Amino acid sequence: PSEIKLQQVEFPRGVIKVNDIPLEVQIADTEPTRVRGLMFQDELPFDQGMLFVFPESGLYSLWMLNMQFPLDMIWFDSDGAVIHIKKNVPPCVIPIEIAAGCPSFVPTGEATYILEVTSGFVERYNITKDSILEIISI
């Protein structure tokens, strides 16, 4: 909804590694933070990301409503193994009234974590199905 932009959402921060690449992440581990995600942020440097953390494994989807830039999305299982990768997902810039027109991206298997990083990260750092998520601190 349009009032989402007006609400301040505080994201805890943490550090993770993917393929030994360290990233500072904003952590979305509550319903309000997961709903807000990276909406309305102007950019995301290559050494930062957003880590969605879920209480149990499931088929969690993402969409790009109110995003300002394209993203790479990586779904991980509870052991940190890559389940699904979606590269260069474009923003969905449509009026909020027809937000249902934004496509959702669903993994091929159940995940516990989803990492959003700026588009090009997966290619730059050779992230593949063999890559591993290591949580340093969240």
Where are these regions (language model features)?
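Compact, glycine-rich, soluble single-domain proteins
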Residues: 2-138
